[in-house]
Amino acid sequence: MAIRKYKPTTPGRRGSSVSDFAEITRSTPEKSLVRPLHGRGGRNAHGRITTRHKGGGHKRAYRLIDFRRNDKDGVPAKVAHIEYDPNRTARIALLHYADGEKRYIIAPKGLFQGAPVESGAGADIKPGNNLPLRNIPTGTTIHAVELRPGGGAKMARSAGSSIQLLGKEGTYATLRMPSGEIRRVDVRCRASIGEVGNAEQSNINWGKAGRMRWKGKRPTVRGVVMNPVDHPHGGGEGKTSGGRHPVSPWGKPEGRTRKNKASDKLIVRRRRTGKNKR
């Protein structure tokens, strides 16, 4: 993938850039692997906003991605097409299996049209192949990794992301995550070889608010610039600080609140945060 920069012919074009989509080999998805996708606009079943700044955007269809691949062990496949997926930053690859079935997978870097792909314990260590962690050599770069055996890929699925297999001991493998976190995962969990393609995605300059609206992202307005009727921080003469600790529009204190997960005990070293990121 390469990035094409626009000339500053208009204020919206100034500084903006776009992917050249050179790796895309087909513009229409496989019909049998597409499902309708209805936008919720950040609302729940009661019609109340539960996630702000969502809504609108271009109409999309959902592509069914095979995140497990455990029922195709030993069945060879070929990459028929590399396609665009509006629902994720990574590209997707359409596989044609020898038994006649078609499936989508996340397209890793280096995968091309016509490339052979396989899954199973005996698969070669090549981009796109899927194996259990116990069969992958230490030091290998992997993506689309499961957290629980048979649970489907959960980690390193976005464009340019990858995980490094640091070692294996007993029934656990040690992984270095994209965030820098080091954690242990069951060696029966499966992973795909290589790093996810389309790594230049993070360097795209969107240029104008309208392109964000096409993606279904709405404006984020600060509470201090609202009226008192709209937000607890609103109102006041001139510029004010809000006059209280940060709260949501509904008066609840702002800040991350997360419960500990059962899998947290498998974390060896936490990801770098705050000043430690540098």
From Swiss-Prot:
<comment type="similarity">
    <text>Belongs to the universal ribosomal protein uL2 family.</text>
</comment>
<dbReference type="GO" id="GO:0015934">
    <property type="term" value="C:large ribosomal subunit"/>
</dbReference>
<feature type="compositionally biased region" description="Basic and acidic residues">
    <location>
        <begin position="253"/>
        <end position="267"/>
    </location>
</feature>
<protein>
    <recommendedName>
        <fullName>Large ribosomal subunit protein uL2</fullName>
    </recommendedName>
</protein>
<dbReference type="GO" id="GO:0002181">
    <property type="term" value="P:cytoplasmic translation"/>
</dbReference>
<comment type="function">
    <text>One of the primary rRNA binding proteins. Required for association of the 30S and 50S subunits to form the 70S ribosome, for tRNA binding and peptide bond formation. It has been suggested to have peptidyltransferase activity; this is somewhat controversial. Makes several contacts with the 16S rRNA in the 70S ribosome.</text>
</comment>
<keyword id="KW-0689">Ribosomal protein</keyword>
<dbReference type="InterPro" id="IPR022669">
    <property type="entry name" value="Ribosomal_uL2_C"/>
</dbReference>
<dbReference type="InterPro" id="IPR008991">
    <property type="entry name" value="Translation_prot_SH3-like_sf"/>
</dbReference>
<dbReference type="Pfam" id="PF00181">
    <property type="entry name" value="Ribosomal_L2"/>
</dbReference>
<dbReference type="Pfam" id="PF03947">
    <property type="entry name" value="Ribosomal_L2_C"/>
</dbReference>
<keyword id="KW-0694">RNA-binding</keyword>
<dbReference type="InterPro" id="IPR022671">
    <property type="entry name" value="Ribosomal_uL2_CS"/>
</dbReference>
<dbReference type="GO" id="GO:0003735">
    <property type="term" value="F:structural constituent of ribosome"/>
</dbReference>
<feature type="region of interest" description="Disordered">
    <location>
        <begin position="1"/>
        <end position="58"/>
    </location>
</feature>
<dbReference type="GO" id="GO:0019843">
    <property type="term" value="F:rRNA binding"/>
</dbReference>
<dbReference type="InterPro" id="IPR005880">
    <property type="entry name" value="Ribosomal_uL2_bac/org-type"/>
</dbReference>
<dbReference type="InterPro" id="IPR022666">
    <property type="entry name" value="Ribosomal_uL2_RNA-bd_dom"/>
</dbReference>
<feature type="compositionally biased region" description="Basic residues">
    <location>
        <begin position="268"/>
        <end position="278"/>
    </location>
</feature>
<keyword id="KW-0687">Ribonucleoprotein</keyword>
<comment type="subunit">
    <text>Part of the 50S ribosomal subunit. Forms a bridge to the 30S subunit in the 70S ribosome.</text>
</comment>
<keyword id="KW-0699">rRNA-binding</keyword>
<dbReference type="InterPro" id="IPR014722">
    <property type="entry name" value="Rib_uL2_dom2"/>
</dbReference>
<dbReference type="InterPro" id="IPR012340">
    <property type="entry name" value="NA-bd_OB-fold"/>
</dbReference>
<dbReference type="InterPro" id="IPR014726">
    <property type="entry name" value="Ribosomal_uL2_dom3"/>
</dbReference>
<feature type="region of interest" description="Disordered">
    <location>
        <begin position="225"/>
        <end position="278"/>
    </location>
</feature>
<dbReference type="GO" id="GO:0016740">
    <property type="term" value="F:transferase activity"/>
</dbReference>
<feature type="compositionally biased region" description="Basic residues">
    <location>
        <begin position="37"/>
        <end position="58"/>
    </location>
</feature>
<dbReference type="InterPro" id="IPR002171">
    <property type="entry name" value="Ribosomal_uL2"/>
</dbReference>
